[in-house]
């Protein structure tokens, strides 16, 4: 009896040790993931502190035939394509300090067409859902006011905020609810991520800035980070003054 009791205790101890080892292994994996994410955040933070310029190849149909969220005149000679994340504090800082001036001095004056695309980062767990909600608002002509609400409440991102914001914007709630579950809308967000990644984008906010000709964005400049209005204005004014010429000509 004593031997069976001893064996049972040993078996239980071995099971508990095995479970503990498994938990430790899982914790190590999670710590490795967190470590990688922290490194990414650090790199993005550094990127956002200094202007980075890179010239890309000409982008065809950069505005999705007008189907993407946009502001400004369709005939504007310059364009900015934004890649943003609704949980990104640097994106919020850009909107608060730079975007409003760009809108007043370039977009509203017909000089620049502004296109918004999504680039939710993997470690921002609510960012992709927020991007879907914004795109669903776009279907009902309320993208920009929804975008403003999402950025102003980035700590409360989630279904409750999306629903209350949609109600405040007087959206068709049935249509909005169906859209939130539409795989095609999520696929559009994923396509933006794939497209941005193909351009070398890895952090937010990031921007393509270039001249427009025949529906193409000619050799755009890739600008990374929450840069000042002065940085954007310098790039735009330089492009406006330069003759139209593609790389290699």
Q: Residue locations for each model-derived region?
A:
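A generic local structural motif
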Residues: 65-68, 100-101, 193-194
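N-proximal helix/coil linker or "cap" segments that precede and/or mark the start of modular domains
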Residues: 33-60
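Short gly/ser/thr-rich secondary-structure transition/capping motifs
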Residues: 60-66, 187-190
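A short beta-strand-turn-helix
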Residues: 62-78, 106
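C-terminal cap of thioredoxin/glutaredoxin-like
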Residues: 2-35, 164-249
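Conserved strand-loop elements at the edges of beta-sheets that form or border functional pockets
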Residues: 73, 82, 225
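Short clusters of hydrophobic/aromatic residues that line enzyme substrate/ligand-binding pockets
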Residues: 69-71, 157, 223
């Amino acid at each position: 009896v004593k031997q069976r009791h001893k064996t049972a205790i040993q078996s239980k101890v071995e099971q508990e040790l095995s479970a503990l080892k498994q938990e430790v292994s899982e914790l190590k994996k999670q710590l490795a993931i967190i470590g990688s994410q922290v490194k990414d955040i650090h790199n993005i933070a550094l990127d956002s502190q200094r202007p980075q310029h890179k010239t890309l190849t000409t982008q065809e149909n950069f505005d999705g035939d007008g189907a993407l969220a946009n502001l400004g005149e369709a005939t504007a000679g310059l364009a900015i394509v934004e890649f943003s994340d609704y949980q990104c504090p640097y994106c919020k800082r850009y909107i608060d300090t730079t975007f409003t001036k760009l809108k007043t001095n370039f977009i509203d004056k017909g000089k620049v067409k502004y296109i918004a695309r999504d680039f939710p980062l993997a470690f921002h767990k609510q960012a992709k859902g927020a991007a879907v909600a914004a795109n669903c608002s776009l279907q009902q002509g309320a993208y920009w006011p929804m975008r403003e609400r999402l950025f102003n409440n980035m700590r409360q991102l989630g279904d409750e905020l999306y629903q209350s914001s949609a109600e405040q914007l007087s959206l068709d709630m049935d249509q909005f609810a169906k859209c939130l579950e539409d795989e095609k809308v999520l696929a559009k967000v994923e396509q933006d991520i794939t497209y941005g990644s193909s351009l070398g984008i890895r952090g937010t906010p990031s921007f393509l800035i270039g001249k427009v000709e025949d529906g193409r964005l000619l050799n755009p400049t890739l600008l990374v980070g929450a840069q000042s209005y002065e940085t954007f204005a310098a790039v735009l004014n330089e492009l406006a003054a330069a003759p139209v010429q593609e790389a290699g000509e």
